């Protein structure tokens, strides 16, 4: 049993710490896929040799139903294969992490969480240094130069990421790490503020405006969720929102990227009006948004609506909202920032998000069952 437990802890270490280890611009196969394979082998192997004692988390059920829906509908929609794999991969990542974590106590989970945070800091620091020192001035597929267009120069420092297509996706990873540590700090599992400061600086270096803006917005929302709302809280909230609009709106009113978000919503509405009932309910296939509206969705909800249909969008929302009650609302530490930043960005490969969600679920479960120091095995 000790040998089995040690093997499981090794698998847990790899799946947690490297859950965001994407190097898509450097390697044909990112390390995160290898860690997923390790976790999968351990779960299957343990299930085979310890079938009588295997325990599957109830939280996995809705994820499994979502996966079944995807597997039974997407093959008929001719999806982009890599995009489909990333969606399934991220959902399966949650199932792997949660079902390995169930056999660990919070002492182990918090320790591995710290390793994850510090590994993320090192990885994002390396990514930032490389990207900023290797700007891409010429717009891909054209002869246009970012240096020749007013207000566009900063884009040159976003497209040479070693991790993803551009630094906006790096910003999402940074957001998840930031607010996962913020959750640990608020629940007094960790003490230091240093990782939060470093992660915020690294988010700034991504130059992702959606990620940067999401940080204060999420902290503001999380703060109000802890209060018994009174009239003066509402007045303060309204005042802050008005102040933000006064300061921010003039800066982005003529911004092409900002205006394109409204164009995407308009194109989505037109698509829904002319699409078939089949496409309305089941979607057009993951990765096919551009083929149908002429532009990438750049919106988490629009992406799932168009590509997996109304049913798929409901499943996506369900797997996220189903954890709120079981985690005593702590899953909102991650879901809120993902949804806010998702209004202008849609990433299919978010294994790090689901890994941290799984950890929050198990940590809160252990607290309820008073499994904080000793594992029940």
What are these regions (language model features)?
Residues 18-38, 54-57, 67-92, 105-109, ...:
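Interfacial transmembrane-helix termini
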Residues 1-50, 66-77, 336-340, 352-359:
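N-terminal signal-anchor transmembrane segment
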Residues 24-35, 73, 78-89, 165-170, ...:
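Helix-loop-helix junctions and helix-breaking kinks within/between transmembrane helices
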Residues 114-141, 163-206, 213-224:
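Alpha-helical transmembrane segments of multi-pass inner-membrane proteins
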Residues 252-308:
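Long extracytoplasmic/lumenal interhelical loops at the membrane interface
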Residues 42-51, 70-129, 184, 222, ...:
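Transmembrane alpha-helical segments and their membrane-water interfaces
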Residues 51, 188-193, 216, 220, ...:
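Hydrophobic transmembrane alpha-helices and their immediate junctions
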Residues 71, 128-133, 206, 223-258, ...:
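A membrane-periplasm/extracellular boundary helix in multi-pass inner-membrane enzymes
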């Amino acid at each position: 049993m000790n040998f089995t437990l040690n093997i499981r802890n090794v698998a847990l270490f790899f799946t947690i710490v490297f859950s965001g280890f994407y190097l898509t611009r450097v390697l044909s196969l990112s390390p995160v896929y290898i860690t997923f394979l390790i976790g999968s082998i351990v779960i299957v192997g343990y299930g085979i040799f310890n079938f009588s004692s295997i325990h599957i988390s109830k939280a996995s059920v809705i994820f499994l139903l979502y996966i079944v829906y995807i597997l039974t509908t997407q093959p008929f929609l001719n999806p982009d294969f890599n995009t489909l794999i990333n969606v399934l991969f991220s959902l399966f990542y949650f199932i792997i992490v949660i079902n390995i974590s169930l056999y660990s106590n919070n002492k182990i989970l918090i320790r591995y969480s710290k390793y994850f945070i510090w590994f993320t800091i090192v990885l994002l620091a390396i990514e930032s240094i490389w990207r900023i020192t290797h700007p891409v001035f010429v717009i891909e597929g054209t002869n246009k130069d970012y240096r020749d267009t007013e207000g566009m120069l900063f884009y040159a420092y976003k497209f040479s990421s070693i991790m993803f297509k551009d630094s906006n996706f790096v910003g999402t990873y940074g957001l998840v790490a930031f607010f996962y540590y913020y959750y640990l700090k608020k629940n007094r599992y960790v003490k230091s503020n240093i990782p939060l400061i470093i992660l915020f600086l690294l988010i700034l270096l991504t130059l992702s405006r959606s990620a940067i803006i999401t940080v204060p917005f999420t902290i503001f929302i999380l703060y109000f969720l802890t209060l018994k709302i009174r009239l003066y809280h509402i007045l303060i909230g309204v005042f802050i929102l008005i102040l933000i609009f006064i300061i921010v709106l003039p800066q982005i009113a003529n911004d092409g990227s900002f205006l394109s978000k409204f164009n995407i919503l308009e194109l989505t509405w037109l698509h829904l009006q002319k699409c078939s009932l089949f496409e309305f309910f089941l979607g057009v296939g993951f990765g096919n948004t551009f083929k149908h509206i002429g532009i990438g969705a750049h919106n988490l909800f629009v992406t799932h609506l168009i590509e997996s249909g109304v049913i798929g969008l409901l499943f996506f929302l369900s797997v996220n909202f189903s954890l709120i009650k079981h985690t005593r609302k702590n899953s909102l530490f991650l879901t809120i920032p993902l949804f806010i930043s998702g209004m202008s960005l849609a990433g299919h490969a978010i294994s790090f998000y689901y890994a941290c969600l799984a950890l929050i679920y198990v940590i809160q479960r252990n607290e309820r069952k008073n499994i904080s120091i000793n594992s029940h095995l």
